[in-house]
Amino acid sequence: LALTLFAGGILIGQLLGIPMWESVLGLVVISGLFAMAGGLKAIASTNVFQMALLILVSALLVVVGLHKAGGFSALYEATPGSFWNLFQPNDSPDYPWLAILLGYPIMGVWFWCTDQSMVQSVLGAKDLKTGQRGANFCGLLKILDVPLFILPGIICLVLFPEIKATPDKAYIHLVTNLFPSGLIGLVVVTMLAAMISTIGSALNSLSTVFTMDIYVRKYKPAACNKDVVRIGR
């Protein structure tokens, strides 16, 4: 949750020109109200909406960025070879291959298989087969990470070398410099939907853990469904 708030604060703050603490506070308040009012069903619906928008916007950004950079061949030639190699030397200060090899599987299994905000999405499916299809579809979508979310950072470095000092702002820097005002507005909506959905999922999972593992188990085992929903909200 903290990492999501940090990333969201950077994105929204850079787009709207407001301090990070205001961005974070706004995201928490809006996400909390959204989770309270709609619950998991509303969060799932927002996930589908923001997924489609995010893929569309990112694909368009890659196409426009590659065109500005002179095509993929020109982009490849303009960047160091290490940018296209996932496994860096073990003495790399950023991503040594040993850390990737040992760390990513652990983090991946933790997030995708045990994190409550992810598990609740699968457990909320109407049946086992639907849950399995959703999990497999989510895995297929991860393949899009490389072309849609890594390439924009490399494109930004080629077009705007000064961004190397603040790499966290590369995506939004590319958006604000390549897209017209109307598309920037669409990106703002997409980012807000993605942040609210992610934060709402985390808040909903925290609410579930507190309600079921603390309130029901420790204080009121005989609580009716109405009480459980009220405490969760």
Regions found by a protein language model. Give the residues of each.
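Hydrophobic alpha-helical transmembrane segments
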Residues: 21-26, 52, 97-101, 183-187, ...
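Loop-to-transmembrane helix boundary motifs in multi-pass membrane proteins
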Residues: 211-233
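Loop-to-helix junctions at membrane interfaces in multi-pass transport proteins
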Residues: 52-185
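Residue-level recognition of membrane-helix boundary sites in multi-pass small-molecule transporters
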Residues: 22, 41-42, 130-133, 185, ...
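Residue-level recognition of transmembrane alpha-helices
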Residues: 24-28, 47, 135, 190, ...
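Membrane-helix boundary/coupling elements in multi-pass transport proteins
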Residues: 1-10, 184-216
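Transmembrane alpha-helix interface/packing and boundary motifs in multi-pass membrane proteins
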Residues: 32-39, 106-107, 158, 189-201
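Transmembrane alpha-helical segments of multi-pass small-molecule transport proteins
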Residues: 3-6, 12-42, 229-233
